[in-house]
Amino acid sequence: FNMKKIVKRIAAMGAAVMMMSSMAIGASAANSYNLHYTKGAPSSDNVCEKWMYGIKAQNNGYLKSTCKSINTSGKFSVLANGYRSSSHTINCGSFDIWNKGTTNWKNSNYKKGYSYDVVAEFGVSGGYTNISKYVSSASASGSFN
């Protein structure tokens, strides 16, 4: 009776279970984002953008998103830019999700039933790169559908 073999087998089973659960979580969270920024924190701790692929438009003219955001200082918005998933070079325009909550932002380029790649990102005055000038702490979470 070999103890090492049993330990290895248990470890392999544990890894397989962990992989399966993380895959399931990944699939359900494919269209959701959780962004956060804290001034002074290491950049690896700040999540300023997330790409989501193949989000199917449910309506003509806009993609719908739910967004909740917390902003402790300064002006803040989450920007979302959509691109046709068939070609990343065709820009489908952009819309803003403000920290007051969201509505359906109009954009005539979106077509119902087509899939789009979307990026949700922190943005201040037109770009998420200068967020540190205006905001000391902010977070946003939501999903596209």
Language-model-detected regions and their locations in the chain:
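Extended, low-complexity, turn-rich repeat/linker tracts enriched in Gly/Pro/Ser/Thr and Asp/Glu
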Residues: 68-77, 128
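Noncatalytic modules at the cell exterior or secretory-pathway interfaces
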Residues: 59-65, 109-128
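Short, surface-exposed beta-strand/strand-loop-strand elements in extracellular ectodomains
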Residues: 73-88
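Non-cytosolic beta-sheet module surface loops
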Residues: 54-57, 67-71
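Solvent-exposed serine/threonine-rich low-complexity stretches and specific carbohydrate-binding patches
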Residues: 38, 88-102
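Exposed low-complexity, polar/acidic, P/S/T/G-rich flexible segments that act as propeptides
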Residues: 126-145
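Exposed aromatic-hydrophobic patches
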Residues: 51, 100-112
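N-terminal prepro-regions of secreted/extracellular proteins
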Residues: 1-56
